[in-house]
Design a protein with these regions (language model features):
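Conserved ABC ATPase signature
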Residues: 89, 128-135
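Q-loop/switch helix immediately C-terminal to the Walker
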Residues: 83, 88-104, 111
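Hydrophobic anchor residue at the start of the ABC signature
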Residues: 142, 181
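Conserved ABC transporter NBD signature motif
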Residues: 57-75
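Conserved ABC ATPase "signature" region
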Residues: 97, 109-124
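Catalytic Walker B motif of ABC-type/P-loop ATPase nucleotide-binding domains
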Residues: 153-157
């Protein structure tokens, strides 16, 4: 039986007076992903941010490896928001290096260059991010996924602004992450062609 990594029980959140969701319960085991679906405004991003500890819930509890979230949880988390966390004044390579450094991941330069090659940014690695398209900025985040060893990925609309080739690479990267025992929580409008025994669905606003 796979290790239970994340447990969410009785979660509820409001936006002002409006109730976004309530009584949300789920678990995520090693080697599996949960895809959160729902219309715009249903609370998908709020749910992800609440799980990560970035938004305080109105009710409920989130536990990691059977305990309250703390430094250990933050050290094992990779959060990718709806907009890529890219600094305009830094190059693609510098942004990647900075993101990995903040995560405490020591990655040799040759591996960073290989990841930038995989995502089609190697020849643009020295360009300031402000000169990159939205899709290219998303590819920096994809390169981080390839390199970051964090076991738990929380990704908000990870396929947005990626072309077909980059989407396919992201899905292969996610599949490999799950195959080696990682876990993921995703908010997405897309059907993810991953093994059915690895992916479950949660619909908000149904």
């Amino acid at each position: 039986m796979s290790e239970r990594l994340l447990e969410v029980s009785g979660l509820a959140c409001r936006r002002g007076p409006a109730l976004l969701f309530e009584s949300i319960d789920f678990t995520i085991e090693a080697g599996t992903a949960l895809c959160v679906r729902g219309a715009n405004g249903s609370g998908k991003t709020t749910l992800l941010r609440t799980v990560c500890g970035l938004t305080r819930p109105d009710a409920g509890e989130v536990r990691w490896r059977g305990a309250a979230r703390g430094e250990a949880f933050r050290g094992e988390l990779l959060y990718g928001g709806h907009a890529p966390a890219v600094k305009d004044e830094l190059s693609a390579e510098e942004n990647l290096h900075a993101a990995l450094g903040l995560a405490g991941a020591e990655v040799p330069r040759d591996r960073m260059h290989a990841a930038l090659t995989d995502v089609g940014l190697f020849t643009r690695r020295a360009l300031p991010a402000r000169r990159l398209s939205q899709g290219q900025r998303r590819r920096i985040a994809l390169a981080r996924l390839i390199l970051d060893p964090a076991p738990f990925w929380v990704l908000d609309e990870p396929l947005t602004a990626l072309d077909d080739a980059a989407q396919a690479l992201l899905l292969r990267t996610l599949d490999a992450h799950l195959a080696r025992g990682g876990a993921a929580l995703l908010a997405t409008h897309h059907d993810l062609p991953l093994a059915n025994d690895r992916v479950r669905q949660l619909r908000l606003g149904a």
